[in-house]
Amino acid sequence: MNKFIILAIFALAVGAMADYPKPAYHAPPPPPPHHLHAHPAPAPVVHTYPVHAPHAKCGANLLVGCAPSVAHVPCVPLPGHAPAHGYGHAPAPHYRAPESDSFDQFEE
């Protein structure tokens, strides 16, 4: 039994000490030429209109959706409405959750 163990250790040591050469590197082949002439460059694409859009009339508003329609709107705002402000002011500092007495015992 000892002979088999010694033989296995010897085979393992010889295999670990072997200096194998690096595997040969094979570069991929160059791509085949598709055509022997150069392709012309594509035409430039212009993403603008040749003229400016017409000015919208004051009395009509185009509503675009599933069913486009034209809604007539007045040129001036309706009377009686105050100008709308943003979302309002921030809440005052006295609007906060009241402090309870049950937490005062932990602060001492």
From Swiss-Prot:
One of its GO terms (molecular function) is serine-type endopeptidase inhibitor activity. GO terms for biological process: oocyte development. Expressed in the middle and posterior regions of the follicle cells. The keyword DNA damage does not apply. Keywords: Secreted, Signal. Residues 52-88 form the VM domain. One of its GO terms (cellular component) is extracellular space. Its main location: secreted. It is found in: Secreted. It comes from the Eukaryota. Residues 87-108 are annotated as: Disordered. Residues 1-18 form the signal peptide. Belongs to the vitelline membrane family. This is Vitelline membrane protein 15a-1. It comes from Aedes aegypti (Yellowfever mosquito).
